[in-house]
């Protein structure tokens, strides 16, 4: 497990050596760094870890409008404790820590199911070389729950030995506090995994009731966070395009939720091949069917997204089950390709972009799988393929340069605020990057960005006052000349 700690540290070191921050150049600073800084100062100013009001953004706003980003995340709480440490450093440290914890939790989870330690290690590396690496420096709340999801799944394994739900409740609560929007999908994944265990037992009703009790305890423990957030979501009344539910029942074979896409699992074609292989083995058939339905049917994405939209980014919560399934199939890799397998291998190629490269990936996958029947260590060669995909999906231009960060942070503005005792600030420089910046809670801003903006206030700004919509949506209000 020491190697699983060193490898992600080495990858982050490579990024740092290029004079880059481990953060994306687009959304990372203006949504995550500045908001976390505002939230930790709200904790300090109210003297409680459960603040209710964010006075320095949007001229004062209910703090639960920002809970989408995780107001009770552990790095925010740590930032409130270490108030003199720059929030950017705390966030980077915490995200790297979560990556390492994810790999270790993945390895420990797989050890419950796989006999081959090398295979557990290999699957943990595949986890690192998925969409996780991209999202851990882009949209943090898409993946920051992942180590706790692996630990919750591992706790389910332990439950069927000890009959205790304590650890399920603990890790489930951590998932909610880090990413309430993705927690529903995580709990659906855990429910699926739990029921796969249950079918072996005659008295499955008792176990089912225990899981319901665990979920209820999670809701009660996090109620101070989840209940106000639900009211905020209801008040937001976010309008979405009319959904054609019948069209969502039609399978789509682009596999965006599984392959190559950063807004999905971001895996490579070997994983689809092995899921198909699992379909033809009794031990792994059920999970393969579940995964194939989830990745092919858009209606699953709609359900996992709380019926808001059918975007495939939510399918990243299936990553632990995909990793487990592929590990199980690889460990018992003794089968011949039949015509049905061949059809399922080839058919998605007609719907995936850059199909010639994907076809090459398919050929490489089949060759490596053939030669790894005897020696599983040969599968390590395939790591070069996802490594190339990660390199392609994470160019240096996607990271925030140190110089650009200093420009966004703008210490001169902070000095100006302190010298002139400025209380309210409109900053027309880098307006898209500083909209959530409160300069250590020294000023009140009219600007702010949150995905759960209140619809009445939103309507007042854009419909009554006729303020120009400067972003590609109505949830952000930036400093403008007419404010």
Predicted segments with their positions:
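Start-transfer (signal-anchor) and selected internal transmembrane alpha helices
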Residues: 1-18, 210, 370-379
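Membrane-embedded helix bundles of polyisoprenyl
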Residues: 4-9, 95-113, 117-160, 164-199, ...
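Membrane-interface coil-to-helix junctions
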Residues: 7-103, 126-146, 233-238, 245-264, ...
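Periplasmic/ER-lumenal interhelical loops and adjacent helix-loop junctions
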Residues: 74, 207-316
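Soluble catalytic regions of membrane-associated enzymes that act on cell-envelope
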Residues: 81, 380-483
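Membrane-interface helix caps and helix-loop-helix hairpins in membrane proteins
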Residues: 89, 132-142, 176-184, 259-260, ...
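Transmembrane alpha-helices and membrane-interface helical segments
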Residues: 104-109, 150-158, 190-198, 275-279, ...
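Contiguous transmembrane helix-bundle modules in multi-pass membrane proteins
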Residues: 289-296, 304-405
